[in-house]
Design a protein with these regions (language model features):
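Long, charge-rich alpha-helical interaction segments
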Residues: 93-172, 176-179
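Histidine-centered divalent-metal-coordination microenvironment in nucleic-acid enzymes
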Residues: 58-86, 90
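A short, contiguous, amphipathic alpha-helix enriched in charged residues
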Residues: 36-54
Length: 240
């Protein structure tokens, strides 16, 4: 959707405001089930890295729906709890697969060796990189040949793109690095969405638009300007 800066009209995407014809527009982001499904996938990928790579017991990981567009993940009883902002920054780079260097993943700048490249059975990021690069063991040899042929710089760029677009976990670095941040209490309402922050015992089945919505059957008068249909508590609302 778009919101007109001049008159405040909210409408579907277009180049000018349908009410006052102004081209001064703001784009509005409205989360949906597809958005939440994508975020859930990132959370599950994060849990895999925390448990498999960092050896954190899954019993010490708690997941909460933030009340808006994402989830909060809490880790307790872990040596990582004592990390400062700088160390958390290094951890963020690892989780998001940032600043990966080709040497770490098999490509030595001088005289690269085929045997040094990661294998699909390798643990941690080596295995994830191999799966992304080669897809299957049968394609590994041919893939390595192309990587060496393309050169060091191309491989470094490809690792960077993989971190941004595919295998890197999408988290909020500003939240993770801030050791003084105060988080919303579970059970409280998010002022942007009106949904509650809730603990998620089963994130794969969790539906925030049903479970975190606290409306009941009592009629409530509201003022709304929203040109799309949405669902809360399995009921349809809009467009308004």
């Amino acid at each position: 959707c778009i919101k007109c800066i001049s008159c405040g009209e909210v409408s579907l995407l277009q180049d000018v405001c349908p009410k006052c014809k102004s081209n001064k527009l703001d784009r509005l982001s409205l989360p949906c089930q597809n958005c939440i499904s994508g975020v859930k996938k990132e959370v599950l990928n994060l849990v895999k890295i925390l448990t498999a790579d960092l050896r954190i017991d899954d019993k010490n990981i708690r997941i909460s729906f933030s009340g808006n567009e994402g989830f909060h993940l809490y880790v307790t009883n872990s040596p990582y709890n004592q990390l400062g902002s700088k160390e958390r920054g290094d951890l963020i780079d690892y989780i998001m697969f940032r600043r990966a260097i080709p040497e770490r993943f098999g490509f030595k700048k001088n005289n690269p060796s085929r045997s040094s490249f990661p294998d699909l059975d390798d643990p941690g990021w080596s295995g994830r990189v191999a799966k992304e690069l080669f897809n299957s063991k049968s394609k590994r040899s041919k893939g390595i040949t192309k990587i060496i042929s393309d050169g060091y710089s191309v491989y470094r760029q490809r690792l960077e793109e993989m971190g941004k677009n595919s295998i890197g976990v999408k988290i909020d670095p500003n939240v993770t690095v801030d050791i003084h941040r105060i988080f919303r209490l579970e059970g409280s309402l998010n002022s942007k969405s009106g949904l509650a922050k809730l603990a998620c015992d089963n994130i794969e089945k969790f539906n925030p638009y049903a479970e975190a919505c606290l409306i009941d059957d009592e009629p409530v008068e509201i003022s709304a300007n929203l040109p799309i249909e949405f669902r809360l508590k399995n009921r349809r609302f809009g467009p308004y």
